[in-house]
């Protein structure tokens, strides 16, 4: 009986050696169960600090953008990778951009959005064509925000989309230049 292998270990080693790898040590890790972000009392992660958050009441990933604008001030650049969003979120981002609270915006969305949410997709395409924001898409289920502010670069990632969410979601909220660059695709 011949043995069958699912992969060749030598080719796997070559593949791993070509992979992008990043390592960073986080000095502080906080675990929090929150009903709302206000419970952080204006606290932001320090450099190389990460908050692991579990929601106890429904709030979306978008809430972090609002929280950062209130505590850190103007957002110079906002990169959002998401599976889903809605008109209300898009309108809020555009309003803040027109008020100068947000500089440039890059939305990276799931390419399935054009089938699942055709009106939202068309609106985003038009905004991209008009030069209001940058739009990219891929077969993706990511939920990440990279937020560049005057006081530092923050990353939020977790299970929540930029729209309606379940009561229980999980997020990692951190301040790190290298993770920001990695998640925003700036160091490729």
What is each residue range found by the language model?
Residues 38-41, 60, 81, 89, ...:
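Aromatic-residue detector
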Residues 61-128:
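Primarily the HKD phosphodiesterase
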Residues 78, 132-185:
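HKD (HxKxxxxD) catalytic microenvironment of the phospholipase D
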Residues 54-55, 108-110, 135-138:
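Conserved beta-strand termini and adjacent loop/short-helix elements that scaffold enzyme active sites
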Residues 52-58, 82-85, 133-134:
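Short, flexible loop segments at the rims of nucleotide/cofactor-binding pockets, characterized by
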Residues 1-75, 98-99, 148, 153, ...:
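N-terminal localization/anchoring segments of enzymes in phospholipid and broader phosphate metabolism
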């Amino acid at each position: 009986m011949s043995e069958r292998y699912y992969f060749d270990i030598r080719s796997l080693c070559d593949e791993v050696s070509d992979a992008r790898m990043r390592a960073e040590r986080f000095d502080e890790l906080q675990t929090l169960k929150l009903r709302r972000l206000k419970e952080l009392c204006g606290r932001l992660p320090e450099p190389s600090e990460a908050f692991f958050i579990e929601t106890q009441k429904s709030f979306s990933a978008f809430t972090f953008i609002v929280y950062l604008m209130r505590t850190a001030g103007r957002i110079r650049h906002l990169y959002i990778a998401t599976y889903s969003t809605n008109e209300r979120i898009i309108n809020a981002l555009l309003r803040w951009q027109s008020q100068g609270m947000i500089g440039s915006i890059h939305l990276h969305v799931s390419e399935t959005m054009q089938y699942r949410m055709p009106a939202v997709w068309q609106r985003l395409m038009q905004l991209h064509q008009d030069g209001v924001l940058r739009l990219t898409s891929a077969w993706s289920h990511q939920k990440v925000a990279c937020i560049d502010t005057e006081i530092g670069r923050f990353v939020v990632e977790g299970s929540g989309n930029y729209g309606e969410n379940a009561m229980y979601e999980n997020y990692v909220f951190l301040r790190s230049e290298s993770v920001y660059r990695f998640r925003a695709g700036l160091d490729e």
